[in-house]
Amino acid sequence: MSRTTVQAMCLVFLLLPGLVQAQNSEQRTGRYLDSIRKQPPLLSAFVHDLPKGGDLHNHLDGAIYAEDLIDFAVDDGLCVDRTSSRLLAPPCDSCEKYTAKPAAQCSYGDHVLYNQMVDAWSMRNWRAGEESGHDHFFAAFDKFGLASHTHVAGAIAAATNRAGMDHLQYVEFMHTADGGAAAKLAGKVEWKDDYAKMREALLAAGMKDVAAETGKKLAAEDARAKEILKCGSADAAPGCGVTVRYLYQVLRGLPREVVFAQILLGFELASSDAKFVGLNLVMPEDWYVPIHDFNEHMAMMDYLHGVYPKVHITLHAGELAMGLVPPEDLTFHIRASVERGHAERIGHGVAVMNEKDPIGLLHEMAERNVLVEIALTSNDLILGVSGDDHPLPIYLKYGVPVALASDDQGVSRSDMTQEYLRAVETYHFSYVELKRMARQSLEHSFLPGQSLWADTKVVFRKAPACAGNLPGAEKPSAGCEEFLAANERAREQWKLEGEFAKFEKKY
């Protein structure tokens, strides 16, 4: 027997008690979950405390609760249309009597107006009737938009703090951070069908300056958010422990020249600013322009991916249901987003079984390791798709990685605890399955560096540098510590494993 073999065997024997203990604590926690499935208060508390990893599908402007938005509107001296609940610019009517255009501040003393605004700006108290969930949901953004656009730091602070309170450690916020600068630049450049020439024209017109200014502005907002949360002080809020990155959010419902300019800006930002880890295309997939221009948008993504091959891409696709659009528009968006849009992740993916050759697509997504960002509450409220009608179990059956996501938790009146709770109650997931989804959220994050995991297909097998260490241990080996120091993604994953160990000790 060689000396190396003896050393390896000794290492196994040294680690075996810890590995058995970790396995036993996981099994014990799983048994506890099984014992409380029919006790909602205990189940809710368990899921709330569960370490959830990351939220990869979170629109910053939709993450803010209406109560915060009312405060923002009051700070800005805005008015509200009493009939529609839409914010308006001043001057406002007095609060002393019933008026059509009261100041937002009037709502503090008028509970009817306050509750009306909260209901109009969210899905609270919405009931199916004349207005669909889809229409009520998306109409909310225009109603509160004047307040959300001017309070970016406050929005970041509020959303990040809720993430921390919800036992998340990482968030990728979708945010159109340039304030319309790319759209203005597009207006100065004549449209060219040749994407290379269009890119050259936009760069010549100052796109790199727009990217630099956008990054500078967001850095200031990010720093201000940390001040609001009192990070670095004894009174630091829970959000201070959350790692935040951004996805540049392209508004695909705008004219094609603006969409191209925004996509280009997204690629430029993700290539030059560490805060921006990728880009996404947003706005309702069923609206006219996103449907009509879908193939052109994929062509734009295909071209610019060739120019910026290292930039990460996640795309909304399949946020559709039968009856919302003609049947033919249900048949290709997810596949096109993966194959031509080069998406590493798909947001929603609800209409996957309406795609041409859906089983073939599922196998392709599993082979390409494309993760689906699952937003259960959002899909129920907007599309009316839930329970057995939702494809989440089908994705899992075919080995497609998934992670739960909040989407627009402020508008939905939800949070990540509710997403996990809905998943447990609806699909009866085991504790091991919940851990897997949380781990996948960080595995498929766009953080730089190598993964802690060498394999995630069946079991999570550690990278060689950390193979001899208990995941999440406070004192990893020198080689593992060096690996973690060099790879941010692995560091976040190691942190999650430590949180799991702490969580499981309670059971």
Language-model segments: residues:
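Metal-cofactor-binding active-site regions of metalloenzymes
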Residues: Q23-Y507
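Intrinsic low-complexity/disordered segments
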Residues: T4, G18-V20, I313
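Bacterial N-terminal signal peptides
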Residues: A8-G18
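Bacterial N-terminal signal peptides that target proteins for export
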Residues: M1-M9
